[in-house]
């Protein structure tokens, strides 16, 4: 059975001033799979995903979701297209509650008064409980630990009911127990036929979670492979652009 592409990004280019951040990048993500995106710092991974999330606009290229072209020029477009992104840096309002952060931008809840806010709190808590996230929906975000705030970022993506969820280094501030919980969430998402794009540099995560892996280098696509067809050495070689045996030349006795 051939895996179906949930996302195709074709010929994506982006420059900032005279700096080419992305050059003719092609990227695919497969439905119901964990699609790992790798590359050294500055390879263009986060920039590419910010294009998908509507945070920045590309200079060239097209995006297809489920085979249909979509125009994503702002975050609202990405949300409407079923895309959610969990950023490495926290994007929360510390003085607001967990529930309010999960529904940030949903004016239907805020404009309808106490009854809908109360119902929204119940829905938020139900979602947190459903995914075994030990967070109180009524708590102020400023009272949460950094790890709890990172899990809240993930909960925000879950609350949007997105079909494509991008996670940018999501385990960077998590404890071992929370990493295990995150992996369980990811497995559940893929079992629901949702697509996960997972940016990571941690090899153990890549091989534990990944179904496909794509590598970028210097703002360009290098390749895409089923995880079963790569090794740690081959991935490192793809990221750095040369055989890693050349990085540690043999000593002559």
Question: Where are the language model's segments positioned?
Answer:
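Glycine-rich phosphate-binding loops of nucleotide-dependent enzymes
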Residues: 2-253
């Amino acid at each position: 059975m051939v895996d179906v592409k949930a996302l195709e990004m074709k010929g994506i280019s982006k420059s900032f001033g005279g700096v080419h951040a992305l050059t003719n990048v092609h990227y695919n993500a497969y439905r119901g799979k964990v699609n790992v995106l790798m590359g050294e710092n500055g390879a263009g991974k986060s920039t590419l995903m910010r294009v998908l999330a509507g945070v920045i606009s590309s200079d060239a290229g097209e995006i297809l979701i489920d085979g249909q072209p979509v125009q994503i020029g702002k975050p609202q477009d990405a949300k409407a297209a079923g895309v959610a992104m969990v950023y490495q840096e926290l994007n929360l309002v510390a003085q607001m509650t967990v529930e309010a952060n999960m529904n940030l931008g949903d004016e239907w809840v805020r404009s309808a008064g106490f009854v809908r806010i109360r119902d929204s709190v119940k829905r938020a808590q139900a979602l947190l409980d459903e995914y075994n996230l030990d967070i109180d929906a009524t708590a102020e975000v400023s009272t949460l630990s950094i790890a709890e705030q990172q899990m809240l970022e993930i909960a925000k993506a879950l609350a949007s009911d997105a079909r494509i969820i991008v996670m940018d280094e999501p385990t960077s501030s998590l404890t071992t127990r929370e990493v295990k919980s995150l992996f369980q969430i990811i497995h559940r998402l893929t079992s629901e036929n949702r697509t996960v794009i997972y940016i990571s540099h941690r090899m153990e995560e890549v091989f534990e979670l990944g179904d496909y892996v794509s590598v970028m280098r210097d703002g360009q696509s290098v390749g895409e492979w089923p995880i079963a067809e790569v090794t740690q050495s081959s991935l490192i070689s793809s990221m750095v652009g040369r055989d890693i045996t050349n990085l540690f030349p043999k000593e002559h006795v």
